């Protein structure tokens, strides 16, 4: 909590994501019908937001060298603390806001127990105008930050040892692959349970903003100070597992998305 630089970095990052949502061009799509029959509109520009951020990071590394981008690695505790506080404050805000006006409440977060409802999420789609807080946090601040944290870990390893291990390269590339895939398929999250059924409370807030980026990057963080050399056989074996797993993951998710949209006539309950 005393790492002022870490806090400043995190909130500067979060504000970038918010500003990018408003100013970066993106198409608008409709979500699934709500219980009321209404369909909400969502702005799809997470991929462009991520591309700008990653492009900026790579430009810094190219111009100033890897040592210039170890800042995220060095200020990891401060970044994590700021993310936790941000997630708690957002959970408090959306819970309080759910009592004002006619809000559509989540069936599972309207128990009457304030602690439970705050944790699970009372309002289904908390918004400020057309800015949807839940879908925004789902893909942007945490997911893209995960990629930046991984890259910072690679830079730390290179700065400390003068070389980069094959293991950390694979971990980082696979993580970024998953992240970019998620950003490309941003509209598919609109059919997922997190968006259609769950309210937005502390559970999703801390999961999206703190748990996801700061635990998912731990493999790269460990390898940053403990390099492991796999060799060509190890690399090829891991690549085979990765490609197989990704194929299953993507095909299964696309099939689920098509079924939820009613576009898969072969699908059955």
Spans of features found by a protein language model:
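Membrane-anchoring alpha-helices and their flanking helix-loop junctions
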Residues: 1-269
């Amino acid at each position: 909590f005393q790492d002022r630089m870490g806090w400043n970095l995190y909130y500067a990052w979060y504000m970038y994501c918010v500003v990018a949502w408003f100013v970066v061009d993106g198409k608008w799509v409709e979500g699934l019908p709500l219980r009321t029959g209404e369909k909400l509109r969502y702005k799809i520009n997470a991929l462009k937001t991520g591309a700008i951020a990653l492009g900026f990071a790579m430009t810094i590394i190219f111009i100033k060298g890897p040592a210039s981008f170890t800042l995220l690695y060095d200020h990891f505790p401060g970044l994590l603390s700021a993310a936790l506080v941000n997630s708690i404050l957002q959970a408090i805000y959306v819970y309080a806001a759910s009592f004002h006006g006619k809000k559509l409440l989540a069936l599972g977060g309207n128990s009457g127990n304030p602690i439970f409802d705050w944790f699970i999420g009372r309002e289904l789609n908390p918004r400020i105008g057309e800015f949807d807080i839940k879908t925004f946090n789902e893909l942007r601040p945490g997911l893209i930050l995960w990629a930046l944290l991984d890259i910072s870990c690679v830079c730390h390893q290179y700065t400390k040892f003068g070389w980069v291990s094959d293991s950390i390269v694979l971990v980082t590339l696979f993580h970024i692959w998953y992240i970019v895939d998620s950003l490309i398929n941003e509209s598919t999250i609109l059919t997922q349970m997190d968006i259609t059924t769950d309210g937005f409370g502390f559970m999703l807030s801390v999961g999206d903003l703190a748990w996801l980026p700061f635990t998912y990057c731990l493999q790269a963080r460990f390898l940053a100070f403990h390099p492991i050399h796999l060799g060509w056989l190890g690399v090829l074996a891991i690549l085979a597992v990765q490609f197989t797993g990704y194929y299953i993951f993507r095909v299964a998710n696309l099939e689920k998305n098509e079924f939820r949209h009613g576009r898969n006539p072969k699908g059955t309950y």
